[in-house]
């Protein structure tokens, strides 16, 4: 199969993966309205073409949390990566490190912190949820710090799991799920050999290290369901600051007021995100939410964005809408499932090339030159910004908590 875009990796991954794994990452919450709008809204953002600008010295390099990135992209946290390729987190981390960008390890990764961090030539990022088991949280933070992780990505949009109907149909959950998964595995021989047989242990490495016993897929579903904490508040983040003195990024912001709260709290960054449309269906796409949030807090806090990003054009669009950098999720997992580390490396090269083309043809020589001026207020773009809540003034210095 010819691979020329991220969409090709998705098609390839669908053939390789057992349905329960493909649909787990490909699907969203409820009717998947927000999942679709993430991609559609972003694709409607029109770039302003400029010519004769002498783009010979174009650079994608940027700085984020005192780290130099070869381009404004990081691999975001995705659970169960090691079920999509043999020791998947390790392979993805190697590809990111070789490209000069961050890799973010999920709390619910297959490979533990101690296995992934050493393969990188730059500090790893670590993602954490607020969970009822505060002992686990403290243990994870201490281990991440000991492994040299530089940045904590704190996911706050999962006080309860979203309703993902696809999972019940695909075999990830529901009646006779284990038997259905087994049958799917034996009928997908490439995955069965690479991951099913040779990718063991199929374990939640970070959780197993804490509990002192193996944890499989059923444990993953049950442990998380019982540990998400609906009482989460800003006080929990204050508690985390006792154990983490590095950069902290709050992931799951969709409202300008929450963004202002993150500034008041003293967070180093936010991720404008709806969890890839996997939590609450019907909320704003990240592309719709981002401009008002940027108007409210740009310059006061680092802004990252995810959800709906499929190529280098989308990266440029998100930056023009107000992001400083972006996180990739599904796009790199499809590539990982298809060709492992080489697939992720190739995807990142494709994204870089697409960004260079977009920047060359919009006259932006550097990431800082990608602004709202890089966009044209076409009918499609206007529809993306329509009905956004008006951004009020930034909080005064005296208002900071």
Swiss-Prot record:
Membrane-spanning parts: none
Membrane topology value: Peripheral membrane protein
Keyword Nucleotide-binding (UniProt): no
Keyword Iron-sulfur: no
Amino acids binding FMN: 106, 127, 155, 251, 306-330
Stored CDD domains: alpha_hydroxyacid_oxid_FMN (cd02809)
Keywords annotated in UniProt: Cell inner membrane, Cell membrane, Flavoprotein, FMN, Membrane, Oxidoreductase
GO molecular function, one term: FMN binding
PROSITE patterns: FMN_HYDROXY_ACID_DH_1, FMN_HYDROXY_ACID_DH_2
EC number: 1.1.-.-
Domain of life of the native organism: Bacteria
Domain FMN hydroxy acid dehydrogenase residue range list: 1-380
Residues annotated for substrate binding in this entry: 24, 129, 164, 278
EC top class, as a word: oxidoreductase
A Pfam family assignment: FMN_dh
Cofactor needs: FMN
UniProt subcellular location: Cell inner membrane
GO cellular component annotations of the record: plasma membrane
Chief localisation class: membrane
Similarity annotation: Belongs to the FMN-dependent alpha-hydroxy acid dehydrogenase family.
HAMAP family, per database record: L_lact_dehydr
Protein name: L-lactate dehydrogenase
Protein species of origin: Cronobacter sakazakii (strain ATCC BAA-894) (Enterobacter sakazakii)
